[in-house]
Each structure stands twice: as structure tokens, then as C-alpha cells.
UniProtKB/Swiss-Prot annotation:
Residues 149-166 have a biased composition (Low complexity). This is Nuclear autoantigen Sp-100. Homodimer. Interacts with members of the HP1 family of nonhistone chromosomal protein, such as CBX5 and CBX3 via the PxVxL motif. Interacts with ETS1; the interaction is direct and modulates ETS1 transcriptional activity. Interacts with the MRN complex which is composed of two heterodimers RAD50/MRE11 associated with a single NBN; recruits the complex to PML-related bodies. Interacts with HIPK2; positively regulates TP53-dependent transcription. Interacts with CASP8AP2; may negatively regulate CASP8AP2 export from the nucleus to the cytoplasm. Signal peptide: none annotated.
Length: 482
């Protein structure tokens, strides 16, 4: 009875252990959402990458950007995007989250990525993953233990409630591995196949020593799928450094061959030297050109490549730009040289404070230009006559002193034509009515009437009109009317 009770307990525990990795991964992602949102300080390129890879829709992307424009904090916007990723969570979400671009842009994600690697060392492999292909191969070092994570590598959603799929995948993968090992062993024994074989080097997570390589016949041209095929053949390959997992090298006898990529721009030459294999044959060195890529921020071993660069001139270009800026600034200073502040020659290096103090200390700058009189005055003029010459604008006349004393409404000015004017009418006749100041506009021998009144030459006329004496006849009529 005890054995019968133990067997179902063992089966349930085995089922729970097979379901735990993805559940723990999902729970760990949920607990790290706040830390991830704090680590991502800007929306670009995180949201754009999620939209381009269809993790979020275009409408949701626009909503998130509009939230940022509405001054919503960036961490809250990123947290909302992580909520959407939680609904579609699988391993591809973690790959997209910790890709090379994000790790370079957001260095605060490094400790979070390391926490995932520490918790799930066999299920995750961020190192060397092809960003363009989410179905990239994992390291063969994981062996059959990575079978349950391979389903998520192909983008398929994991079923947390069933464990039969995991066990069936384990059995199928182990059988395929045994069949491929026997097939590769037969291929390795026949020397005729060596000329038409490709050496595929697969690296484990970021290490520089390959774990295994597989020899495939060239005429078969079949793709290696992670779910169903593993090619393992014992070999010793000595590498200087290789960045990518999926780099393949073709060997033809003892001659060197080159596998050229589609990109002909900035290239790096990586040397691969193979040691002696089990059958005693010595493979020659194979060189290949692969597109140069910057080392990821989270790489465990810094690359020690011997490179031959042709197009990478960023340092020289930046130094040239700096020299150009210095040269243009020097030319600008030479062109300006010195400048003048109120006839004071001050060099360019003099501070503004010194320039202002020097300007204030100069007495010539404090002098104001005095405007001279527009109409010249007669300094020794004689104002003793009964009439004085009067000028207003283009009109000339004569001012009678006696009539001028009687008041401003008395016609005291006679023009050259013989017409009589009051001072205000004479101002209007001279087209100076806008001034409305006849004491200032009418002049006698260059002196204004105001100045002559102040000097006592003329008497200030009263402002009231002189009342005319009433006609006695009119007064008599008014009395009779009463």
C-alpha cells in the first residue's frame, strides 16, 4: 500500500518539476516589472522595437506615445507596455527585452538580465542570440534538459496544465540525438565525404571554446532544427574568438576557403585553427569574413579579435570634426579681432566687465551731443522799436507791441500783404497749428516770444477778451422790453 501511495506522489512531483520552470520564469518576470520600468529611462528604442516585432499593436504604440506627450512619467508608460507583454509572455519576450540594442541603450537592465540567468541557467541563453531570428539555436551544453524551453524558442505558447507534451518531446529528442550520432559516426569513418562537408561550430553561452560540431553532406542541404536534430561528433577546435553561434565554416582538403557574407562593408577577419581530430588528419587554418558587430554590453568575455578594418573611421572623423570646429572658432576670432565700444579699442579676450568699466571711466562717452538752434539768433538785436519783425514758418510779418499788450485775442500782427492776425491765427497761417504753442513758434529776430517775455522785452498778454462797451440804444430797447 505504501508503494502504491508513493507512485502517484512521485508522478505529481515529477509533473510539478516539469511545469515549474515556465511558471517560475513568468512569476520572476512579474516581480521584475517595476525594476524593468525604472531601468528603461526613454521610450526609444524600446517601444519602437516592440511595435516593429509586433509585440504591441500600432494603436497601442500611438497611445503610449500620446501618454508621454501628455507628461505621463516614462516609467509608467513602460510599465503599461510590460503589462501587454505579460499577456503574451514566452521566452521570445525575454529575448526582445534583453537584446543587444536595449542592453546598450539601457545599462541598468544588466543586473535584471543576470538575475534571470542565475534563476534559470539552463532554460535561458541571452548570449549570442540572433535578434532577427527568435528560433536561434541554444547551446548543446544544455542537452536534453533544455527540451521544455525549446518549445518556447519556436514561438509556441506553453501549456502550463499538461506535462505529457514535455515528456514526449524529451523522448523524441533523445531518439533523434541517438540516430544522428550513429549517422555522423558513419560519415566520419568514410574519408570521401570530407571534401563535401561543412563544419558547424556551436558555442555555449558566450564561451570561446566550442562544445561540438557536426558534419553534414553538402548534397543533402538540410536545415538543423532545434526541436528534432542534433549533430554531435567528437572534435577539438581551437578558436581565437568567435562572436556568433551560428557561424559555419566550409573546409576543402588542406586549402583555405572563405565564406563571404552579404554585407561587404566594415568587416573583421577572424582566424580559426583546428587541432588534430580523432582520425589523425590535420585540418588547415580557415579564415572567414563576418560583418563586424560591437561587443554587447553583457558579454562575459571581451573579444580579442585581430581585425583588419577598412571602413571604421569614427575616431578619425570625430577628431577631424573637433579640429574643424577649433579652426573655425579661431578664424572667427581672427576675423573679429577687436571691436569698438564708443571709440575704445578693446581686444577680444577682454571680459565684458572690464569693457563696461572702461567705457564708464571714459569722460568722452559721458558727454552728450548738444543740438544747436535750428534758427540762428541775433545776439545784439535791437528790440526798442514799436514794431518787431515776426516770423512763423514761411510767413513773415510785424508785431505791434501796444496791441500785443491788450490780449491774445487782439490782432496785433500784420502780414506783408497787410492782413491782421492774432498770434494764434498767425501760427495757423504759418502751418504750425499742430504745435498749439504760438509763444514758441513765433520768433522775432531768432528769439521766440516766450524768451522775449521772460527777458522783459514784451509784456505777457492777458488771456481774457476785452469787453466791448454796450450800445446805449440797445440797452434802452432791452429796458423797454421789460
Amino acid at each position: 500500500m505504501e508503494d502504491s501511495n508513493a507512485s502517484p506522489r512521485m508522478s505529481t512531483e515529477h509533473e510539478n518539476t516539469e511545469m515549474h520552470p515556465f511558471e517560475y520564469m513568468f512569476k520572476h518576470f512579474k516581480t521584475q516589472k517595476v525594476a524593468i520600468s525604472n531601468a528603461i529611462r526613454s521610450t526609444f528604442p524600446f517601444l519602437e522595437s516592440l511595435r516593429d516585432r509586433e509585440f504591441i499593436t500600432g494603436k497601442m504604440y500611438e497611445d503610449l506615445i500620446d501618454s508621454c506627450r501628455s507628461l505621463v512619467p516614462v516609467d509608467k508608460v513602460i510599465y503599461k507596455a510590460l503589462d501587454e507583454l505579460e499577456k503574451k509572455f514566452d521566452v521570445t519576450v525575454l529575448w526582445e527585452l534583453f537584446n543587444e540594442v536595449n542592453m546598450e541603450k539601457y545599462p541598468d537592465l544588466n543586473p535584471i538580465r543576470r538575475s534571470f540567468e542565475c534563476v534559470f541557467p539552463n532554460e535561458l541563453s541571452f548570449q549570442g542570440i540572433d535578434r532577427g531570428n527568435p528560433n536561434s539555436q541554444l547551446s548543446l551544453e544544455q542537452g536534453p534538459s533544455a527540451s521544455y524551453s525549446q518549445g518556447s524558442l519556436n514561438g509556441s505558447s506553453l501549456d502550463l496544465s499538461s506535462s505529457e507534451g514535455w515528456r514526449s518531446n524529451d523522448r523524441r529528442n533523445s531518439n533523434l540525438m541517438q540516430a544522428n550520432q550513429t549517422e555522423n559516426h558513419q560519415l566520419a569513418e568514410s574519408p570521401g565525404h570530407l571534401d563535401s562537408c561543412e563544419l558547424q561550430v556551436q558555442l555555449n553561452n558566450g564561451d570561446a571554446t566550442p562544445e561540438s560540431y557536426s558534419l553534414l553532406p553538402q548534397h543533402e542541404e538540410r536545415a538543423v532544427q532545434l526541436n528534432n536534430e542534433f549533430q554531435i561528433n567528437p572534435c577539438f577546435v581551437q578558436l581565437i574568438d568567435v562572436k556568433k553561434e551560428n557561424s559555419s565554416f566550409s573546409l576543402a582538403g588542406n586549402q583555405q576557403t572563405r565564406a563571404r557574407t552579404n554585407q561587404n562593408e566594415d568587416s573583421e577577419v577572424i582566424e580559426l585553427s583546428s587541432g588534430d581530430s580523432d582520425d589523425g588528419e590535420n585540418f588547415s587554418e580557415a579564415t572567414t569574413t563576418i560583418p563586424s558587430q560591437p561587443a554587447p554590453a553583457y558579454s562575459r568575455t571581451p573579444p580579442t579579435l585581430r581585425t583588419d578594418r577598412r571602413g571604421d573611421t569614427s575616431d578619425t572623423e570625430s577628431s577631424i570634426i573637433i579640429r574643424r570646429r577649433k579652426r573655425t572658432g579661431r578664424k572667427k576670432r581672427e576675423r573679429l579681432g577687436s571691436y569698438l565700444i564708443r571709440n575704445i579699442k578693446i581686444p577680444m579676450k577682454t571680459s565684458w566687465k572690464t569693457a563696461v568699466l572702461a567705457r564708464s571711466a571714459n569722460t568722452s562717452s559721458q558727454r552728450r551731443r548738444k543740438r544747436g538752434p535750428r534758427i540762428p539768433r541775433e545776439e545784439n538785436a535791437d528790440f526798442g522799436g514799436a514794431e518787431l519783425p515776426a516770423v512763423c514758418g514761411n510767413v513773415q510779418g510785424f508785431l505791434n507791441k501796444e496791441k500785443f499788450k491788450q490780449g491774445i485775442y487782439v490782432r496785433s500782427i500784420r502780414s506783408e500783404t497787410g492782413r491782421l492776425f492774432t498770434p494764434m491765427d498767425f501760427e495757423i497761417e504759418g502751418n504750425c497749428e499742430k504745435a498749439k504753442n504760438w509763444r514758441q513758434t513765433i520768433r522775432c529776430k531768432g528769439w521766440t516770444l516766450r524768451e522775449l517775455i521772460q527777458k522783459g522785452v514784451l509784456q505777457d498778454p492777458p488771456r481774457k477778451k476785452k469787453e466791448n462797451p454796450r450800445n446805449p440804444r440797445q440797452m434802452k430797447r432791452q429796458v423797454n422790453a421789460l
